[in-house]
């Protein structure tokens, strides 16, 4: 019943292939970790468009069903079954997305040991702030995913209810109200998550442009 857009982390415009060898500086190793994190999040990024398309289709199905009368119960049941399949597909994408983010989070965890090895105090402080932002981002994504799955559970229950001929208006309104409340949570978390992602991207850009960071990579 609503559509959300999720921000993604951006990679470096130009990246030297360094590979974290024994001779790599902490700065080089840190950049490798950050760019590998982008790679790990790629499946998550790729899931966004099809997920949004499914959300749009579900919205259309919902509006069509709500426009039908009880005399068209066969059509309501047919469309509800289609909507239930839509819910299952969205759940699959969310699960793939979460797997991608879990792997990215695990990869990014390596950043900490390289940040601790940075010699420049100001650079280290900047990198620690970036790390804190990314950790907060992953925490928000976990909350967002949990809330979105609650929405899908609510949607599934709704379309199962709509297939019943003895469904009352009171039951329908109660379920729709419950789903809308969860959507409000998703919307709020989505906004916070996108803000945190943009904050991380800016922090990463600033870190890469820091002269102390560039010097140690040369």
Segments predicted by a language model, with ranges:
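Extended amphipathic alpha-helical segments
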Residues: 58, 62-65, 76, 115, ...
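Primarily heptad-repeat coiled-coil rod domains in cytosolic scaffolding/tethering proteins
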Residues: 25-28, 32-35, 71-74, 78-81, ...
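C-terminal motif of bacterial Sec signal peptides marking the signal peptidase cleavage site
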Residues: 16-19
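Extended amphipathic alpha-helical interaction segments
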Residues: 97-179, 186, 206-214
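Immediate post-signal-peptide N-terminus of mature secreted/exported proteins
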Residues: 22-95, 99
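Extracytoplasmic/luminal low-complexity segments enriched in Pro/Gly and acidic/polar residues
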Residues: 188-218
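Bacterial N-terminal signal peptides that target proteins for export
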Residues: 1-8
């Amino acid at each position: 019943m609503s559509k959300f857009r999720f921000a993604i982390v951006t990679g470096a415009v130009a990246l030297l292939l360094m590979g974290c060898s024994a001779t790599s500086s902490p700065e080089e190793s840190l950049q490798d970790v950050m760019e590998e994190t982008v790679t790990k999040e790629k499946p998550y990024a790729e899931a966004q468009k099809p997920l949004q398309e499914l959300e749009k289709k579900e919205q259309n199905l919902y509006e069509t069903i709500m426009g039908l009368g009880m005399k068209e119960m066969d059509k309501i049941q047919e469309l509800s079954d289609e909507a239930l399949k839509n819910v299952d597909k969205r759940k699959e994408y969310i699960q793939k997305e979460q797997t991608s983010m879990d792997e990215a989070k695990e990869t990014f965890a390596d950043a900490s040991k390289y940040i601790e090895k940075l010699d420049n105090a100001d650079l280290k402080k900047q990198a620690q702030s970036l790390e804190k932002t990314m950790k907060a981002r992953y925490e928000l994504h976990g909350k967002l995913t949990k809330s979105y799955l609650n929405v899908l559970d609510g949607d599934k229950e709704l379309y199962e209810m709509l297939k019943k001929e003895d469904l009352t208006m009171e039951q329908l309104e109660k379920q729709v109200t419950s789903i809308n409340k969860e959507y409000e949570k998703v919307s709020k978390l989505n906004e916070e998550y996108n803000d945190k992602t943009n904050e991380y991207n800016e922090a990463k850009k600033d870190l890469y442009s820091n002269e102390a960071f560039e010097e140690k990579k040369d």
